[in-house]
Amino acid sequence: MGFHHVALAAADMEATHIFYTEAMGFELVKAVVAPTPDGGWAKHLFYDTGGSKGLIAFWELHDDALPPVRGGISTAVGFPEWVNHLAFDPIDAEHYEMCKKRWLDLGADVVEIDHGFCTSIYAVDPDGTLVEWCLDTRTLDEQDRAHAASALFDPAPALEDPPVPDFHLADPSVTPPWKR
């Protein structure tokens, strides 16, 4: 069973829309505009991620009873951006490379990491949420499951070597469209 959608509040819906349509290639497919419980109103905007079933949605909130949106899903609660993040599944290796090129062409710096079982590229959305394209490079097997089960409740598990990031810097003369 998958998920239907993940919903996040956006501080700047225009910048968020530009990022998720132009940089991610997602399509806006549904909007629900309704009152909020405390007398304001909100737009709930749904984007098709282009993969299997599963949407991402953003709230544009117009309600003085609610606090302003502050930071990404990780930094807003005091964690570094790498802790809470969004990871999307590219169609294949060609799509993964196309996503990396698109981010760089649009002016976004990209971090790439080979995790051993998957390879990932990372960029940051307008609210400061880390966004990832994660390409599986091998099938998880019984050895992976056994390791996960033993690590789950081990108070002092053996540490693995940290992955080495590869930094792809965008042309500094290009301003990402969601930052204009």
Regions inferred by a protein language model and the residue ranges of each:
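Vicinal oxygen chelate
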Residues: 3-11, 46-50, 69-180
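Short, acidic Gly/Pro/Ser/Thr-rich loop/turn segments
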Residues: 54, 65-66, 138-140
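A compositional/structural signature marking long, glycine- and acidic/polar-rich segments
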Residues: 63-64, 78
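Short Gly/Pro-enriched turn/cap motifs at secondary-structure boundaries
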Residues: 35, 77, 111-112
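Histidine- and/or cysteine-centered catalytic micro-motif in compact active-site loops
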Residues: 61-63, 91
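Core segments of cupin and vicinal oxygen chelate
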Residues: 9-60
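A broadly used, surface-exposed interaction patch
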Residues: 58, 65-70
